[in-house]
């Protein structure tokens, strides 16, 4: 079992938001807080809403209604509000109104700063323009923009008029955009001419124009001009941002809506079929995301948060919402963390005085390849918290980040949940010690547990399904236009219990761990493990940059392990490397999990938030349909995996095999370059 590597100092615990919240609710400690929340959820969420300072126009009569079942819980009955009352209006006539709300750095180094006053004015002017176009609470507004200051105004203006924002990944092609806009029934979109990425201007309005040829419901397209480029223009549909906001007032009142009115319609990838539309409400999303980051992870008004992401993933709306709820400053960045210099991310931290840094394990693994010189030369002493979400860590990457980014001083807080949760299920706080890759505990108010297939809690150290025994205020209100899919996906395995689809465990110290998606689990000869454990062992060899471990049908063991690997720079994709990969897994997990197949590729299929899509890898390796691929940033990687894996099925085994019937296959070169190699054992 790993050793504890960090504990907060007593003074830091005493000064933390989680300690203040615990004291306010009269709990003795974190475990007592969990127990009180489970014993009286209505009391807990009522206290949480009050503590967060969420503003209602009309107070609610009841905290929640479960009369239709846990899956269809409604919240804050009778209450009316608008999220922007808590994000903008409450800061007027306070010192916060004059402080920085948004700091932005473009890829070329240009910096722009908006105060809360400027953000408020920009939001209200655009809201007035949208209202003049006839948009209001019945409308869905697609937002297809990079993380520039105006994306915050676009989101808040949409919310202010009561319309529903539909975030769209800035790297989507026209088909993915059209699919989501049609499903949402969008009537307007807000976009930009283009954005810089790795030294190139990436067009965005032309992509949206092409998408809109297949979306007849969209009547209006608002376009932000940020570059001197010629644009095709439809006078009946297109509106120049600067033109429509000119002369509009700096203040317009928020349209008051029901507390349960949708704020966001966020699409996530579906395993099969169309993407899933999650419905996040004004009260639900704002309170839940605020509780997780302000209370649990200690975001404070004087923090500057940087979390390099995209508005099309829920982290984008999260950053904008939680920073303004706290009165903190968001640091937005155009482009990638390693361009134009490999140390760009660390320079941004020092120069913008970032104190709350969000990272993804994939990003850290990529930056690790440059060594430690790039990170060590920058002053990261201002970091108060480093937070992580998106996927499980490998032990090596977590330790590297804790050592070289956190400097063993700032905590590395793990946080897991998802778009459908509207926040997290597991989190770390200043009250919890840290071990590599751990979560401190469950988020209060959700009754997280770990169950076996029969619905019984698993023993300490055992792996099971991560579930919620109680609905949370942040949960999606179903799936857009698909209630049957919602019930089947999340509520069908255990009665009135949310099954999240992740494998999790708890150790003897009460710390939690996530082992990957439960539908990615490998079961070899009756023994079960998550792919993250195998992948961690593979990457710990130093030979492999990234890996995806999948299970393939095997007549003897039920499943056999295939590792699809990206070799580290300078490492040969040959039998020697493949055998070292096999040996590392066997040494760590036992011979039963020794990979039968090792496949080398140049890229792995990833989503917009850089998660490796194992289900896509598995489908490609078996020549099956990969389902919805619109969220992939690199769909060509699917073809590469399929092409390489096809060598197993299309080429007969060598005549000479060992007693187990296994065989070796040589590296395959395509057009004189390494394409892929499948090396069965």
Q: What are these regions, as identified by a protein language model?
A:
Residues 286-304, 314-355, 370:
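Conserved AMP-binding/adenylation subdomain of ANL enzymes
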Residues 168-194, 208, 350, 357, ...:
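AMP-binding/adenylate-forming catalytic core of the ANL superfamily
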Residues 325-328, 354-359, 368-434, 447:
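Gly/Ser/Thr-rich phosphate-binding loop
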Residues 98-100, 221-223, 234-267, 274, ...:
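Conserved pre-ATP/AMP-binding loop-to-beta segment of ANL
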């Amino acid at each position: 079992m790993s050793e504890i590597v960090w504990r907060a100092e007593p003074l830091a615990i005493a000064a933390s938001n989680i300690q203040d919240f615990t004291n306010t609710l009269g709990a003795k400690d974190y475990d007592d807080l969990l127990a009180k929340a489970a014993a009286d959820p209505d009391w807990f969420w009522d206290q949480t809403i009050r503590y967060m300072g969420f503003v209602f126009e009309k107070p609610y009569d009841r905290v929640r209604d479960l009369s239709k079942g846990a899956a269809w819980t409604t919240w804050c009955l009778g209450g009316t509000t608008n999220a922007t009352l808590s994000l903008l209006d409450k800061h007027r006539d306070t010192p916060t109104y004059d402080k920085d709300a948004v700091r932005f750095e473009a890829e070329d180094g240009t910096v722009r700063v908006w105060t809360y006053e400027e953000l408020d004015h920009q939001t209200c002017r655009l809201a007035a323009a949208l209202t003049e176009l006839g948009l209001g609470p019945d409308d869905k507004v697609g937002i297809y923009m990079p993380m520039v200051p105006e994306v915050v105004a676009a989101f808040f203006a949409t919310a202010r008029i009561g319309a529903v924002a539909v975030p769209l990944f800035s790297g989507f092609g026209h088909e993915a955009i059209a699919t989501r806009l049609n499903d949402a029934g969008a009537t307007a979109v807000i976009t930009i001419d283009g954005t810089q990425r790795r030294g190139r201007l990436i067009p965005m309005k032309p992509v949206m124009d092409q998408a809109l040829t297949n979306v007849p419901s969209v009547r209006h397209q608002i376009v932000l001009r940020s570059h001197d480029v010629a644009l095709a223009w439809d006078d009946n549909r297109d509106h120049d941002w600067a033109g429509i906001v000119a002369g509009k007032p700096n203040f317009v009142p928020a349209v008051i809506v029901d507390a349960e009115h949708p704020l966001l319609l966020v699409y996530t990838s579906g395993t099969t079929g169309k993407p899933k539309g999650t419905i996040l409400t004004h009260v639900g999303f704002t309170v839940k995301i605020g509780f997780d980051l302000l209370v649990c992870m200690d975001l404070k008004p004087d923090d500057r948060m940087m979390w390099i992401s995209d508005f099309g993933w829920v982290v984008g709306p999260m950053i904008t919402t939680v920073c303004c709820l706290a009165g903190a400053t968001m640091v937005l960045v155009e482009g990638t963390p390693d361009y134009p210099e490999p140390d760009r991310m660390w320079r941004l931290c020092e120069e913008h005085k970032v104190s709350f840094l969000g990272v993804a394990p994939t990003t850290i693994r990529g930056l690790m390849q440059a060594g430690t010189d790039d990170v060590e030369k920058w002053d990261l002493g201002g970091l108060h918290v480093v937070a992580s979400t998106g996927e499980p860590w490998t032990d090596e990457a977590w330790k590297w980040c804790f050592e070289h980014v956190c400097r063993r001083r700032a905590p590395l807080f793990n946080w897991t949940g998802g778009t459908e949760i509207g926040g997290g299920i597991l989190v770390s706080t200043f009250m919890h010690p840290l071990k590599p890759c751990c979560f401190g505990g469950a988020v209060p108010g959700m009754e997280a547990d770990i169950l076996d297939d029969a619905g019984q809690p698993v023993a300490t150290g055992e792996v099971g399904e991560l579930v919620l025994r109680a609905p949370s205020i942040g949960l999606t209100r179903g799936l857009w236009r698909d209630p049957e899919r919602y019930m089947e996906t999340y509520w069908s395995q255990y009665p009135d219990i949310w099954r999240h689809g992740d494998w999790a465990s708890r150790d003897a110290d009460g710390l939690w761990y996530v082992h990957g998606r439960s539908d990615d689990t490998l079961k070899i000869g009756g023994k079960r493990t998550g792919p993250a454990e195998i992948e961690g062992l593979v990457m710990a060899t130093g030979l492999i940059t990234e890996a995806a471990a999948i299970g393939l049908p095997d007549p003897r063991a039920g499943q056999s392990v295939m590792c699809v690997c990206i070799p580290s720079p300078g490492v040969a994709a040959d039998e020697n490397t493949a055998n070292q990969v096999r040996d590392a897994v066997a040494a760590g997990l036992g011979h039963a999990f020794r990979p039968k197949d090792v496949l080398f590729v140049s890229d792995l299929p990833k989503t917009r938030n850089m998660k490796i899509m194992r289900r896509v890898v598995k489908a490609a390796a078996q020549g099956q349909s990969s389902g919805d691929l619109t969220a992939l940033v690199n769909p060509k990687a699917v073809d590469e995996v399929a092409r390489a894996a096809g060598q197993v099925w299309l080429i007969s085994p060598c005549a000479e095999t060992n007693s187990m019937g296994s065989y070796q296959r040589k590296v395959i070169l395509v057009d004189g370059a390494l394409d892929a190699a499948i090396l069965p054992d």
